[in-house]
């Protein structure tokens, strides 16, 4: 489990307009015609970039700070380290008095061929130093409801719309819900855990529960899932004892529902095999209707290498840190565990579930395995592969599971076409709403290539980052594109966040370490005067475009 303390970045690519008609062969990394075209259509920066704001992502393995609406017409980007003391909507962006209070920037466009414009600058109603508002952003399908987490927010209050001004529990965490009417945004709710944790003394997990470490919205925006990876209860299952604090960083997830404009907590969800430090709730994902819920525990230590359907647990232990994904379903207001998902080659410290994503129908779940050690390439590689290296290599992998009826099974296992040690392939990923496009990032990948399908075997730009775009036809997955930033440089960490529209035709990618001082849309990419300001790159995929050789930037 090497390099977990590294840093991440988000970049959404811009204005390169590179058209490509090649597909990268799943086994060899060679290319074949017929994948359509992918082009970079926007380069997006904060309207107030500052050094270390990390526009698009707060840090390595921390949060999904970029979100797209289902139609791809609204985009939200978090900058968790932004330092303005402004409150709520469109306040003073030039203030820098509250370090790492965090901010979110909302962008909109009229159509998928129209230019992007910033619509709102969004701040917490109670900005606090170090709260990191914007750590996670989530959007409803129409983009009119937005959830934003501040997982280091320090209020001790519980439930909905409580006292925001208390700061007695560092890292307690909070989630804020905003709604849009026309083009106007307003805050609808301030949401806290029903068992906001106790103040600790060690400055890390021993402080608060980190409610809001992960979050997800249903398509209609009426169901919200929130992970608190440092919750300390020893409860198991649904709605157990929330007030116990004997199991450090076991983790939990919370389900909230909205009726009209009022939010209430529906469920408190714990792993069936709760254990200390497994971090259940590290990543969460809801189906479109909100009735299927995937949640990970990326340090879970189960020994299984198969999916276990229909069992309530607990599950056998024996491989520390392999990680697991749990799938729950809802009938009415009642939640039930449906399946326990494990990778077919699970080994100690692989970390399955560092990120999870789910299709709209809930029948496809993708999970990242960033510390997996196998050096094979492609989809379902046939070459022998050692995933139990004496030295942890963190090459990384991803896996897709599918559901037929109520039965889950592993469908595909993904490796980069250019696997490299400590690339962290699978550190971020997202599956499209239709389930047929999968974007997987390797945010520490080292190639100096720029644009689409460039040279993959170059290692001269350390931790520049890359994104790999896969497509599914029937049950078969292939890699379509190898994607790099248009201004790719070392330590930019392109791929620290990824987001896809429902049809997979719009992709946004964050690079938290990008250094340009540009503001707004399509500014100067070549400037490097504001270190780790961050950027986001937007790409457009056209599956029917005629293939042609990639343009050279």
Which residues does each PLM region occupy?
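Juxtamembrane cytosolic interface motif at the C-terminal end of transmembrane helices
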Residues: 19-25
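Bacterial N-terminal signal peptides that target proteins for export
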Residues: 1-10
């Amino acid at each position: 489990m090497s390099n977990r303390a590294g840093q991440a970045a988000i970049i959404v690519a811009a204005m390169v307009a590179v058209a490509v008609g090649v597909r990268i062969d799943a086994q060899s990394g060679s290319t074949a015609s017929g994948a359509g075209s992918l082009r970079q259509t926007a380069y997006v920066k904060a309207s107030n970039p500052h050094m270390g704001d990390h526009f698009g992502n707060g840090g390595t393995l921390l949060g999904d700070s970029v979100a797209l609406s289902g139609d791809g017409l609204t985009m939200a980007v978090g900058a968790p380290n932004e330092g303005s003391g402004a409150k709520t909507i469109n306040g003073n962006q030039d203030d820098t008095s509250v370090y790492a209070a965090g901010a979110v920037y909302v962008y909109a466009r009229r159509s998928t061929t129209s230019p992007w414009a910033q619509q709102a600058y969004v701040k917490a109603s109670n900005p606090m130093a170090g709260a990191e508002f914007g750590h996670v952003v989530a959007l409803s399908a129409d983009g009119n409801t937005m959830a934003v987490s501040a997982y280091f927010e320090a209020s001790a209050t519980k439930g909905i719309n409580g006292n925001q001004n208390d700061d007695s529990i560092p890292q307690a965490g909070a989630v804020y819900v905003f709604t849009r009417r026309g083009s106007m945004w307003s805050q609808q709710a301030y949401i806290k855990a029903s068992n906001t944790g106790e103040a600790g003394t060690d400055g890390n997990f021993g402080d608060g529960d980190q409610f809001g470490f992960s979050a997800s919205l249903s398509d209609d925006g009426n169901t919200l899932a929130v992970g608190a990876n440092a919750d300390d209860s020893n409860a198991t299952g649904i709605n157990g004892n929330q007030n116990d604090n004997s199991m450090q960083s076991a983790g939990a997830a919370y389900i909230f529902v909205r009726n009209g404009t009022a939010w209430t907590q529906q469920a408190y969800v714990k792993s069936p095999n709760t254990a200390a430090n497994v971090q259940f709730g590290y990543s969460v994902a809801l189906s479109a209707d909100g009735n299927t819920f995937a949640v990970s525990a990326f340090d879970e230590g189960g020994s299984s290498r198969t999916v276990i359907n229909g069992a309530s647990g607990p599950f056998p232990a024996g491989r520390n840190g392999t990680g697991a994904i749990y799938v729950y379903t809802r009938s009415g207001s009642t939640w039930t565990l449906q399946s326990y998902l494990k990778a077919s080659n699970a080994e100690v410290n692989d970390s399955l579930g560092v990120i999870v994503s789910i299709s709209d129908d809930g029948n496809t779940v993708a999970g990242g395995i960033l510390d997996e050690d196998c050096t094979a390439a492609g989809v379902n590689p046939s070459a022998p592969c050692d995933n139990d290296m004496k030295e942890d290599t963190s090459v990384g992998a991803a896996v897709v599971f599918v559901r037929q009826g109520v039965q889950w099974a592993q469908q595909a296992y993904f490796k980069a076409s250019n696997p490299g040690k400590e690339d962290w392939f699978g550190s971020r990923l997202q599956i499209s709403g239709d389930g047929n496009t999968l974007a997987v990032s390797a945010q520490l990948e080292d190639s100096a290539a720029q644009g689409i399908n460039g040279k993959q075997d170059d290692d001269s730009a350390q931790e520049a980052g890359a994104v790999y775009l896969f497509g599914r036809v029937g049950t078969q997955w292939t890699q379509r594109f190898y994607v790099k930033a248009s201004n790719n440089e070392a330590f930019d960490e392109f791929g620290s966040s990824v987001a896809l529209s429902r049809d997979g035709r719009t992709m946004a990618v964050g690079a938290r370490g990008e250094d340009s001082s540009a503001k707004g849309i399509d500014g100067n990419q070549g400037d490097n005067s504001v270190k780790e300001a961050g950027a986001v790159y937007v790409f457009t995929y056209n599956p029917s475009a005629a293939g042609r050789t990639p343009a050279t930037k």
